[in-house]
A protein has these predicted regions:
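Conserved short histidine dyad/triad with adjacent acidic residue
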Residues: 60-77, 105, 116
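Short beta-strand His + acidic residue motifs that chelate non-heme Fe in jelly-roll/DSBH
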Residues: 72-74, 92-93, 114, 119-125
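Positively charged n-region of N-terminal signal peptides that target proteins for export
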Residues: 1-4
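A short, N-terminal "cap"/entry segment at the start of jelly-roll beta-barrel domains
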Residues: 18-58, 147-153
Length: 153
């Protein structure tokens, strides 16, 4: 009996000492940014850190790197959106009309969430990186259909 307990403890100690897998860890210099999808304005970069935002269900985590002055027109999502500002200043306003004078400014470390169907718009002040976490599929609905970049020729 003592041998069996010792063997279990030894196995547990070996597992605890094993190095953590590195394929689910992203250091800032190794984040795989690429172009944003067509439903957001060109010019920003996007990295999928976890999950698949286009899947029919499941969690996803993405990062969006935006240049200074980058704007996202008023839009809404059918599912909750959780946003953390990683760097820069992210400006967010609520409503159906983009109005920079009514936007709040959020520095790195800030967190906000938008409930389903909440109409909002955003802008980067300086190069800005935000991390977005939510439930798939990520749907992006513009208040004004003419603002949807994927519909422009």
């Amino acid at each position: 009996m003592k041998f069996a307990i010792l063997a279990v403890l030894l196995c547990a100690a070996m597992l605890a000492a094993s190095p953590a897998p590195v394929d689910n860890v992203f250091t800032p210099d190794k984040i795989p940014y690429g172009p944003v999808p067509a439903f957001v304005p060109a010019g920003a970069q996007l990295a999928v850190l976890e999950g698949d935002p286009t899947a029919s269900s499941g969690d996803f985590t993405i990062r969006i790197k935006m240049p200074d002055g980058y704007r996202i027109a008023p839009h809404w999502h059918p599912k909750r959106e959780n946003v953390t500002v990683v760097s820069g200043t992210f400006k967010v306003g609520m409503g159906d009309t983009f109005d920079e004078t009514k936007m709040g400014s959020f520095a790195a470390g800030s967190f906000a969430y938008m409930d389903p169907d909440m109409h909002h718009y955003a802008m980067a002040s300086g190069e800005t990186i935000v991390q977005v976490h939510g439930m798939s599929p990520l749907a992006f609905n513009y208040v004004n259909a003419n603002d949807d970049p994927s519909k422009k020729k």
